[in-house]
Each structure stands twice: as C-alpha cells, then as structure tokens.
Curated annotation (Swiss-Prot):
Protein name: Carbonic anhydrase 1
Major localization class: cytoplasm
Subcellular location: Cytoplasm
Regulation of this protein's activity per its record: Inhibited by acetazolamide.
EC number in record: 4.2.1.1, 4.2.1.69
UniProt-annotated binding residues for Zn(2+): H95, H97, H120
Catalytic activity: hydrogencarbonate + H(+) = CO2 + H2O; urea = cyanamide + H2O
Keyword Acetylation (UniProt): yes
PANTHER family: CARBONIC ANHYDRASE (PTHR18952), CARBONIC ANHYDRASE 1 (PTHR18952:SF282)
Coiled coil: none
Molecular-function GO terms, alphabetical: arylesterase activity; carbonate dehydratase activity; cyanamide hydratase activity; zinc ion binding
C-alpha cells in the first residue's frame, strides 16, 4: 500500500514537508511556542462566543494520521464569534494531536512547556465565503480554537469520543457520531492567546486565526493510550499504530501573540 505523500515518520514527516509544500517554511506557520512575557495584552479583544448545536454532529472518521469528528456546516447552527474575529465562523470538525509518550503531544507550547495532547476545533468564515473549500486558503478563511490537554485525571467529557474509536480502528473507517456539543470540551475559563498562523499539517495554508485557551483540560494516561491504539493502516494491512501526530513549533518570524487577559 503506497504511503501518503506526508505523515509523521522520518521519511515523510514534518522535516520533509517543505519539499512538497514549500509554504512549510513560510512566515506564518503553526504551531508556535507562546512566550508569555512577550505576549501583548490587547484590550480590544472581545470575549469568545461559541454556540454549538449538538444536532449538527455528524460522523467520526479515521483519516490515517488522526481522527476527525465532523459537523454539518450548511447553516449557522454551530458558530464561533468574538475574540479576534470580525466575522462569524462555522464549526466543521474537531480533532486531536498527541505524542508517543505523555511527556509531549501538544503542538503549541507555553514558555517551552509541552502538554500531553491538544484539541483543535476548526471553523471556516461563512460570512465571507460560501464553502470550506473556498475559505481554506484565504488569510481570514479559518479560525481554530486550540485547547491544551494535561495528563492527570480522566476527563469524562471525552468518554463518548473514546467509546466511538472502536468502530474506526483503521484508516478510512467512519461511523455516525451524533448529538454532541463540543463546547463541553472547553475549559471553564475562555481567556485566550491569539495570533495569525497556519494549518499544522499539509497543505499548511496560512489561513488560520489561532485562538489558544490559556486554561488546559485534563486527560488521563489511559485515555491517551486509546488515541494511540488507533491504526493508520487500512484494514488487512500490517498494524501501524498512530503513535504521534504533532508538528514541532515553528518560528514566530516577527508575529505578535496577543492576550485577552
């Protein structure tokens, strides 16, 4: 079975991505290390407002390098507004990044500290664009909420997601995933950092307004192990567990990280 043109191992991992995706060396790449002493408190930032309708939750899919929970995005039932955004952005999926051990796994870091995993809730600008495909490469096309996950207590809010993983063990498998409000995964405080960045895997478009929550959420060692037990191969091929899928931090190159607090 041919391997995809990118992944996370030595042959096709982040160090190699620039060969096929030159933007990998661009000026607005993500993730980044948030140096708290260099962030700028911006009083003009509004509070984040999320309004997610559980009825829009649709499907859970093993995409080979991760799994996605997808949402119906043909109307404004599940939207993100406020914060640094001047438009309304529609939720279309969320996914996680994790590492081969609990010591690392997040993509963003804070003062060099790595977290065990990271949740990304991905939205597109439905005020200006007519589809995700149209918005994906535009500078103001996407907005992603990033939530750092710290190993510790089991997080009961993750249970429904973990229970669904059995049905999507191998690449290409999908299963219905309905009646779920992902705002339950957010931390109690919505204080955030924000900066202009990119998708953290190919095509690496520099089209993302990042909103990183200051407060982390918990995940247990056992819960993380369930993420890693997913397979990146198709059914019938040799088992290749999804050990890690996190890109190293990229240089800020003059960008400012603003803080809401």
């Amino acid at each position: 079975m041919a391997s995809p043109d990118w992944g996370y191992d030595d042959k096709n991992g982040p160090e190699q991505w620039s060969k096929l995706y030159p933007i990998a060396n661009g000026n607005n790449q993500s993730p980044v290390d948030i140096k708290t002493s260099e962030t700028k408190h911006d009083t003009s930032l509004k509070p984040i407002s999320v309004s997610y309708n559980p009825a829009t939750a649709k499907e859970i899919i093993n995409v080979g390098h991760s799994f996605h929970v997808t949402f119906e995005d043909n109307d404004n039932r599940s939207v993100l507004k406020g914060g640094p955004l001047s438009d309304s952005y529609r939720l279309f999926q969320f996914h996680f990044h994790w590492g081969s051990t609990n010591e690392h796994g997040s993509e963003h870091t804070v003062d060099g500290v790595k977290y065990s995993a990271e949740l990304h809730l991905t939205h597109w600008n439905s005020a200006k664009y007519s589809s995700l495909a149209e918005a994906a490469s535009k500078a103001d096309g996407l907005a992603v909420i990033g939530v750092l996950m710290k190993v510790g207590e089991a997080n009961p809010k993750l249970q429904k997601i973990l229970d669904a993983l059995q049905a999507i063990k191998t690449k290409g498998k999908r299963a219905p995933f309905t009646n779920f409000d992902p705002s339950t995964l957010l931390p109690s405080s919505l204080d955030f950092w924000t900066y202009p960045g990119s998708l953290t895997h190919p095509p690496l478009y520099e089209s993302v307004t990042w909103i990183i929550c200051k407060e982390s959420i918990s995940v247990s060692s056992e819960q993380l192990a369930q993420f890693r037990s997913l397979l990146s191969n198709v059914e019938g091929d040799n088992a290749v567990p999804m050990q890690h899928n996190n890109r190293p931090t990229q240089p800020l190159k003059g960008r400012t990280v603003r803080a809401s607090f």
